[in-house]
Swiss-Prot record:
The gene is LA2. Keywords: Nucleus, RNA-binding. This is La protein 2. Expressed ubiquitously (at protein level). PANTHER family: LA PROTEIN 2, LUPUS LA PROTEIN-RELATED. SUPFAM superfamilies: RNA-binding domain, RBD, Winged helix' DNA-binding domain. It comes from the Eukaryota. One of its GO terms (biological process) is tRNA 3'-end processing. GO terms for molecular function: RNA binding. Residues 370-385 have a biased composition (Basic and acidic residues). InterPro entries: La_dom_prot, La_HTH, La_xRRM, Lupus_La, Nucleotide-bd_a/b_plait_sf, RBD_domain_sf, RRM_dom, WH-like_DNA-bd_sf. It comes from Arabidopsis thaliana (Mouse-ear cress).
Amino acid sequence: MASSFNEETAKKLLTQVEFYFSDSNLPTDGFLNREVTKSKDGLVSLPLVCSFSRMRNLLGLGNINREDIPPRIVEEVANLLRTSDFLKVSNNGQRIGRGTKLSKPEEVLEQVHRRTLAASPFEYSIKMEDVSSFFSQYAKVNSVRLPPNIADKRRFCGTALVEFSSEQDTQDILRQSLVYAGADLVLIPKSDFDCQRENMIKQLGKSESHNEFRRGQIVKFALKWIASEEKVTNKEKPSALKNKIKEKEDKETGIADREKENGDNSCASLCKDNTDQLVVPPWNNSNSVSSEVLKDLFQRFGSVEHIEYSGGLDSGYVWFTDSETAMKARAAVEFVGGLVVKNNFSVALEAINGEMERELWKRLSSAELEGGKEGHKKEKGKDECFENVQPTKKARKEP
């Protein structure tokens, strides 16, 4: 029976099916590997293989179910696959598989990794066929993979993984200086790529965890100016404050429950009224408080993520690394009736609730990631995408 496939389509179909059952793919293809393993003769349904997305595209079948694939198409594909020295087709043309049994998957994967290199940069719209065609000029290519960006799985990361037919070919290519579309290609072993990518995934995980919104971490603080001629009655030495905080820890849970029920309590409800204090806006005093001083103050209770405060204002926000620390700070400040800063200011804390808390979190997150204004600065360069990571070897442009 004459095939209806043209030469180009026939070549692509044969290459695709050989890839499905190859050492490069089968050990890591969970679905197909299970189908092969549970089959006594190692063969699987050819209509099933024809229903794979790339096969459907090559066959022009659209979104058809395997049960609805015309028998004529399956027969033509079977006849085409019989020309392969690598594949085995059943007598009835309904089943397909490898001609030889797959070796131990662990050993096969190790060999594949040694035959593979990572090449970059490639444009994000590039096709696997283009990469394969380019490297086929230098050695036989077994397979090409285009890994997704770790931060956006819908996009190509810019680095192609190219497997050659032998480890020696791979080593020879790594020593060459190649140029693609006017760009010097960076060539590194796959093992280096895997290490760099793993580090990027870890950093991204830390970043996502860090940027996850959690209630109760952000607290508003208010400053009251204490007249110099008045006696400060609530000044606490650091050691005394720590002792009072410790004494208060057993009562924190109850305080937190009351605060949740009365989340809109004013600052005055958290800081005792004191007749010794005269409320005067801090900006009228030359000894205004800096964000660094406030950060040192709040770090008595635990780690502080960010401080939003401009000198001269009478309020700001402190972002603790966890809600437990924020609760401890609020409970302790309420217990001692307000903290005293530089002998001139009393600091009271107030809960933030509802949508306002989420909006503040978005704003403080952006400021913290940008390095902040007067708050603590985050080390930059940790969350860059893999394609920006400096490789271990850089290819130079050909003369």
